[in-house]
Amino acid sequence: MNLHELKYNEGARKEKHRVGRGHAAGKGKQAGKGQSGQLKRTGSKPGFEGGQNPWYRRVPKRGFNNVNHIEYQVISIETLDAAFPDKAEINPEVLHEKRIARNKNLPIKLLANGATKKKFTIKLNAASKKAIELIEKAGGKVEVI
């Protein structure tokens, strides 16, 4: 027996049944959808609950979502001090390589938690005023890209 001569066992594979192709095909007329009605059509929209007040209208709402809000990955000076040697160049690519910043889609912001005496050259999407002040006080440089 060769590989191309292999066959499935009898009844192991069912043939696909094409519905709505006439009586002779076996699944004609109503095509397994029952009698004419709303659910025989292409379907209702997502979230439709048959006329009952849908979930997204029953649940109370609070506040609002600011369209212009930017979510940052925050990184502290303390973290950079522990992870990098003196005079290191720090940018988003390096932070992703070292797995300090996990999400490549979010911008990175430097915060002033902790302190450092190392002279870093930092290029990030955002930094707090205090963080910039601390890095420059240590002799480093911060550039917002």
Swiss-Prot record:
Region of interest (Disordered), residue spans: 1-56
Gene3D superfamilies found in the cross-reference section: 3.100.10.10
Basic residues compositional bias, start-end: 14-26
Superkingdom field: Bacteria
Any GO BP: translation
Basic and acidic residues bias (residue ranges): 1-13
Gene Ontology molecular function, alphabetical: rRNA binding; structural constituent of ribosome
Signal peptide (UniProt feature, chain positions): none
Keywords: Ribonucleoprotein, Ribosomal protein, RNA-binding, rRNA-binding
Family matches, as InterPro entries: Ribosomal_uL15 (IPR030878), Ribosomal_uL15/eL18 (IPR021131), Ribosomal_uL15/eL18_sf (IPR036227), Ribosomal_uL15_bac-type (IPR005749)
One cellular-component annotation, GO: cytosolic large ribosomal subunit
Homology family: Belongs to the universal ribosomal protein uL15 family.
HAMAP family assigned to the protein according to its UniProt record, in alphabetical order: Ribosomal_uL15
Function: Binds to the 23S rRNA.
Oligomeric and partner information: Part of the 50S ribosomal subunit.
Name of the protein in its database record: Large ribosomal subunit protein uL15
Naturally occurring in which organism (per UniProt): Mycoplasma mobile (strain ATCC 43663 / 163K / NCTC 11711) (Mesomycoplasma mobile)
Lineage of origin: Bacteria, Bacillati, Mycoplasmatota, Mycoplasmoidales, Metamycoplasmataceae
Gene: rplO
